[in-house]
């Protein structure tokens, strides 16, 4: 999907997500619980800096902003960022497609957390592991990558969700398979929690 898709979706995005979440249907079954789980990790530690990749309308990032965190928010949709700016007027916003390259403005910066919610699955499968590794230099010591997404422990779990979702399933997305990522990134520590039949939250960092 390109930026124009999300520009056109921006006005109705939050309502569409809410409807899918409330119905416990694909693709956003468990959405609020995903956000709550990620927020619980972040808000349990002292205030610092967060990089939110694919921030969208800023629904999650605004929780951290309101709690005093310094937010750097990246998205490729200007219309989405307009909504995020309303929620976080003093945050730092960068318009860019992180799947192609991180903004140069981030060079040399480090964060307690790098967060991605419902964005990582836009990366092609062959790029996902390398992308995660490319984020490591941006983490402070003991920093974590937090991913909430349509994602699965195994390929079999994905196939079950696909069957359950029927015609609604989108075959053009690249929903992460945790088992495969762990095999490709043996030096990283993965913790994950299954939130719904089509959502997990991952917490990723260097093994110590």
Language model regions located:
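A conserved beta-strand element that flanks and buttresses the S-adenosyl-L-methionine
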Residues: 115
């Amino acid at each position: 999907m390109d930026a124009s898709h999300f520009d056109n979706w921006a006005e109705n995005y939050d309502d569409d997500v809410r409807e899918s979440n409330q119905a416990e249907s694909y693709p956003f079954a468990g959405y609020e619980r995903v956000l709550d789980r990620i927020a619980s990790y972040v808000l349990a530690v002292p205030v610092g800096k967060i990089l939110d990749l694919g921030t969208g309308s800023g629904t999650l990032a605004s929780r951290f902003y309101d709690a005093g965190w310094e937010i750097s928010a990246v998205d490729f949709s200007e219309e989405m960022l307009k909504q995020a700016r309303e929620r976080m007027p003093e945050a730092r916003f960068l318009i860019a497609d992180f799947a192609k390259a991180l903004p140069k403005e981030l060079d040399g910066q480090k964060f307690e957390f790098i967060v991605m919610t419902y964005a990582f699955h836009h990366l092609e499968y062959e790029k996902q592991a390398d992308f995660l590794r490319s984020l490591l230099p941006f983490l402070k010591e003991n920093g974590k990558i937090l991913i909430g997404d349509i994602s699965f422990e195994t390929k079999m779990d994905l196939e079950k969700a696909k069957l359950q979702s029927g015609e609604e399933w989108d075959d053009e997305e690249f929903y992460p398979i945790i088992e495969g990522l762990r095999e490709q990134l043996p030096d990283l520590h993965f913790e994950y929690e299954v939130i719904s039949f089509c959502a997990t939250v991952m917490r990723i960092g260097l093994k110590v």
